[in-house]
From Swiss-Prot:
It is found in: Virion; Host nucleus. GO terms for cellular component: helical viral capsid; host cell; host cell nucleus; ribonucleoprotein complex; viral nucleocapsid. Keywords: Capsid protein, Helical capsid protein, Host nucleus, Host-virus interaction, Ribonucleoprotein, RNA-binding, Viral nucleoprotein, Viral penetration into host nucleus, Virion, Virus entry into host cell. InterPro entries: Flu_NP. Residues 1-21 are annotated as: Disordered. A motif (Unconventional nuclear localization signal) lies at residues 1-18. It comes from the Viruses. SUPFAM superfamilies: flu NP-like. One of its GO terms (biological process) is viral penetration into host nucleus. Homomultimerizes to form the nucleocapsid. May bind host exportin-1/XPO1. Binds to viral genomic RNA. Protein-RNA contacts are mediated by a combination of electrostatic interactions between positively charged residues and the phosphate backbone and planar interactions between aromatic side chains and bases. This is Nucleoprotein. GO terms for molecular function: RNA binding; structural molecule activity. A motif (Bipartite nuclear localization signal) lies at residues 198-216.
């Protein structure tokens, strides 16, 4: 990590603030959440949504997407300069679902972006409140992480589909700032860098001229973000090599892929935040909750509390299982797509099943789907316990570089042991250790080989009763260690296609 002095907590990243004490952080995160809630209430009034319709997660997503699109400066500028048929660059909209005569009706709405921006600023004391926008982006990203697999994107960049647990935040827009960078997985950063290097290989002007200078700065910044996620000196030294390369090419791509593989055992630090749909915040504000006064944290008990007493609905397709839809959204709310299923199940108090066994498609409904057969049901988003979200990779003892769980990027700071067959993963590292990074590669492989499967991650950390808001008495669960529960294995989910 960066030196202690420059390290900001997630909440500071989230609210763009400088160093603050815990109370100030809780207040500024609360202010951000309250702003989202007030905006949502105002939009429901504008759209004349009934209470039930306002609690529909599909309506929430449409409203969130509208405000994100209204503030997307780059795309707005692009749309104005490249007018495409049938797209008004000044308008934004989407499907709103209404309940009419016992049936769900889809209505496509269109709003002036300027009007949406006005409502958003008004809800946020006249400010642009970028932090709130980023928060909604992270919620959408967490939902995508739980819904789609990125096998195709991995294969396209020359990575292995088994690296899917490194892909948190792979659908976050570039403009998501420090808070966005904190939640991106190692694989996501590697993929962004490889795409950049490939463009440089194919387009000789990519690194040249005034634009090239900006590109180079962006490249080095991304390298530093990735370097900060690694926890061993050898991995970081290798990142320095990649960053300082005069003319990044295939050697750098090789190094990055090696690093991504190594991150399957030597886990990177990736932040996890519980970002909830806007309608949940709207409900709380409407019921008189003052987020700024009470304070709020994205990594503590608060989101669990909020979900305990919020009723959110979802449209359900004819052959979908409402319990499975609930699991999908629960995982998205807690950013738990890459968590060990045993840990998630324990916290949720219901069995959380791998994605390949879910009878549910994504939450969003395509415009060509038939509304006649749509039903709706309540999402069960409550939990049995709560646990603190982590930003570490869950490697065993932090003093000496060591291993974390393979195929899992932990979300919750809860003790678990590491059931892994090191041999299967080490097989990925046979062969190439020559070249400029050979000594680092050798060192990384040595660290991985010395990792002991019987080690325990998050030693002594447990879950808490929902009545235990100060986290005083941890309950350390014991898991059946015969198998590690990855959500992704044996998977047949749809691909994410933008």
């Amino acid at each position: 990590m960066a030196s202690q002095g420059t390290k900001r907590s997630y909440e500071q990243m989230e609210t763009g603030g400088e160093r603050q004490n815990a109370t100030e952080i809780r207040a500024s995160v609360g202010r951000m959440i309250g702003g989202i809630g007030r905006f949502y209430i105002q939009m429901c009034t504008e759209l004349k949504l009934s209470d039930y319709e306002g609690r529909l997660i599909q309506n929430s997503i449409t409203i969130e997407r509208m405000v994100l699109s209204a503030f997307d400066e780059r795309r707005n500028k692009y749309l104005e300069e490249h007018p495409s048929a049938g797209k008004d660059p000044k308008k934004t909209g989407g499907p709103i679902y209404r309940r009419i005569d016992g049936k769900w009706i889809r209505e496509l709405i269109l709003y002036d972006k300027e009007e949406i921006r006005r409502i958003w600023r008004q809800a946020n004391n006249g400010e642009d409140a970028t932090a709130g926008l980023t928060h909604m982006m992270i919620w959408h990203s967490n939902l995508n992480d739980a819904t789609y697999q990125r096998t195709r994107a991995l294969v396209r960049t020359g990575m292995d589909p088994r690296m899917c647990s490194l892909m948190q935040g792979s659908t976050l827009p570039r403009r998501s700032g420090a808070a966005g960078a904190a939640v991106k997985g190692v694989g996501t950063m590697v993929m962004e860098l490889i795409r950049m290097i490939k463009r440089g290989i194919n387009d000789r002007n990519f690194w040249r001229g005034e634009n090239g200078r900006r590109t180079r700065i962006a490249y080095e910044r991304m390298c530093n973000i990735l370097k900060g996620k690694f926890q061993t000196a050898a991995q970081r030294a290798m990142m320095d090599q990649v960053r300082e390369s005069r003319n990044p090419g295939n050697a750098e791509i090789e190094d990055l892929i090696f690093l991504a593989r190594s991150a399957l055992i030597l886990r990177g630090s990736v932040a996890h935040k519980s970002c909830l749909p806007a309608c949940v915040y709207g409900l709380a504000v409407a019921s008189g909750h003052d987020f700024e006064r009470e304070g709020y944290s994205l990594v503590g008990i608060d989101p669990f509390r909020l979900l305990q007493n919020s009723q959110v609905f979802s449209l359900i397709r004819p052959n979908e299982n409402p319990a499975h839809k609930s699991q999908l959204v629960w995982m998205a709310c807690h950013s738990a797509a890459f968590e060990d299923l045993r840990v998630s199940s324990f916290i949720r108090g219901k069995k959380v099943v791998p994605r390949g066994q879910l009878s549910t498609r994504g939450v969003q409904i395509a415009s060509n789907e038939n509304m006649e057969t749509m039903d709706s049901s309540t999402l069960e988003l409550r939990s049995r316990y709560w646990a603190i979200r982590t930003r570490s990779g869950g490697n065993t003892n932090q003093q000496r570089a060591s291993a974390g769980q393979i195929s899992v990027q932990p979300t919750f700071s809860v003790q678990r042991n590491l059931p892994f067959e090191r041999a299967t993963v080490m097989a990925a590292f046979t062969g190439n250790t020559e070249g400029r990074t050979s000594d680092m590669r050798t060192e990384i492989i040595r660290i991985m080989e010395s990792a002991r499967p019987e080690d325990v991650s998050f030693q002594g950390r447990g879950v808490f009763e929902l009545s235990d808001e100060k986290a005083t008495s941890p309950i350390v669960p014991s898991f059946d260690m015969s198998n590690e529960g990855s959500y992704f294995f044996g998977d047949n989910a749809e691909e994410y296609d933008n």
